[in-house]
């Protein structure tokens, strides 16, 4: 019985020892695997901690970048508003400059027309001054003629006065001779009186007739001379009045033309001053437009440079953040 039991127990013990050894081996291998798994878990936990830290950092950076993007968008919107305002102001300035240029062209045309009118007025004034000089010369000639005729009238009046005086003297002489004859007849006798009376009757009528004829002729001549003098004086009075009226008209026309010339010169000066003012204003507007265009170009260059510098989507940091976030998403999906 004992031998049979021993024979039956020995293989069982051997089998049990083999199983123990295999179990020990398995336990050792399991312990080693457990250590490896624990090391892996520790490393994975460390990696996850690092990943979570990197994720938080990436989220912070993403938030900061989002804030910066919002700020940049606001700045861009403000810059766009400023650009729109500056472009509208530049367009207004250009419209005002066009208006000023049109006004300048109009004022130039007005100045040219006023200058042409002033030149024509000056030519008219020169022509009128020449006409006035001619009229003054003719007036002087007429005045000389009038003075000459006045001298002639004075001479005729003197001749009339001398002839009247000579007539009176002749009459007085005739009366004196008659008195002397009558006195001589009264003193002499009757015979001589008869002879003298006969002589007087023969001579005196003839002498009286001749004297009367001469006196009548002289009176007619004097009357004709008086009529001629009156006609000449009236004619030359009318001529002098006409010349004086013409002279007054010429003087008035000359004064009116001088006033017109002064007005045209004043208008020309005003037009020149307005053109100078408009030119200065145009130059100022051109300078302002140039400054605005320079500012706009500078702003555009700055914005382009800042856009190139701050292009968020092409930066390496953004690419790193995107790659880290993709890696985190892959790890979470594997879990």
Swiss-Prot record:
Sequence motif: Bipartite nuclear localization signal, positions: 239-260
Membrane-crossing residue ranges in chain numbering? 312-329
The signal sequence is none
The protein's predominant localisation is nucleus
A single Gene Ontology CC term: nuclear envelope
Record's bilayer topology term: Single-pass membrane protein
**Entry keywords, A to Z:** Coiled coil, Membrane, Nucleus, Transmembrane, Transmembrane helix
| Chain segments annotated as coiled-coil in the UniProt record | 55-85, 125-260
Q: Which InterPro entries match?
A: NEAP1-4
Which compartment or compartments is the protein found in? Nucleus inner membrane; Nucleus, Nucleoplasm
From what superkingdom does this record's organism come? Eukaryota
Q: How does it assemble?
A: Forms homomers and heteromers with NEAP1 and NEAP3. Interacts with SUN1 and SUN2.
PANTHER family noted in UniProt: NUCLEAR ENVELOPE-ASSOCIATED PROTEIN 1 (PTHR48145), NUCLEAR ENVELOPE-ASSOCIATED PROTEIN 2 (PTHR48145:SF5)
The protein depicted here goes by the name: Nuclear envelope-associated protein 2
**Provenance organism:** Arabidopsis thaliana
User: What does the organism's lineage look like at the top?
Assistant: Eukaryota, Viridiplantae, Streptophyta, Embryophyta, Tracheophyta
């Amino acid at each position: 019985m004992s031998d049979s039991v021993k024979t039956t127990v020995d293989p069982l013990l051997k089998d049990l020892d083999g199983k123990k050894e295999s179990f020990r081996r398995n336990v050792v291998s399991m312990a080693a695997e457990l250590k490896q798994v624990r090391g892996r878990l520790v490393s994975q936990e460390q990696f996850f901690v690092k990943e979570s830290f990197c994720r938080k950092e990436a989220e912070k950076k993403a938030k900061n970048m989002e804030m910066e993007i919002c700020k940049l968008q606001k700045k861009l919107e403000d810059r766009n508003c400023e650009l729109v305002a500056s472009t509208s102001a530049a367009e207004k300035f250009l419209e005002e400059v066009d208006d000023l240029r049109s006004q300048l062209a109009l004022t130039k045309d007005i100045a040219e027309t006023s200058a042409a009118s002033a030149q024509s007025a000056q030519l008219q004034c020169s022509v009128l001054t020449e006409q006035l000089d001619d009229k003054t010369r003719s007036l002087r000639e007429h005045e000389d003629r009038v003075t000459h005729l006045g001298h002639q009238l004075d001479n005729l009046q003197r001749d009339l006065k001398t002839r009247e005086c000579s007539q009176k003297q002749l009459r007085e002489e005739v009366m004196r001779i008659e008195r002397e004859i009558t006195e001589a007849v009264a003193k002499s006798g009757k015979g001589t009186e008869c002879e003298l009376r006969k002589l007087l009757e023969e001579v005196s009528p003839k002498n009286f007739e001749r004297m009367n004829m001469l006196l009548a002729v002289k009176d007619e001549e004097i009357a004709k001379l008086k009529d001629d003098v009156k006609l000449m004086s009236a004619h030359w009075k009318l001529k002098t009045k006409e010349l004086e009226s013409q002279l007054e008209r010429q003087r008035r026309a000359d004064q009116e033309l001088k006033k017109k010339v002064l007005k045209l010169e004043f208008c020309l000066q005003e037009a020149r001053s307005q053109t100078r003012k408009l030119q200065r204003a145009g130059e100022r507007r051109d300078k302002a437009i140039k400054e605005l265009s320079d500012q706009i170009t500078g702003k555009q260059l700055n914005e382009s440079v800042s856009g190139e510098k701050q292009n968020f989507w092409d930066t390496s940091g953004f690419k790193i953040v995107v790659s880290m976030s993709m890696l985190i998403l892959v790890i979470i999906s594997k879990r």
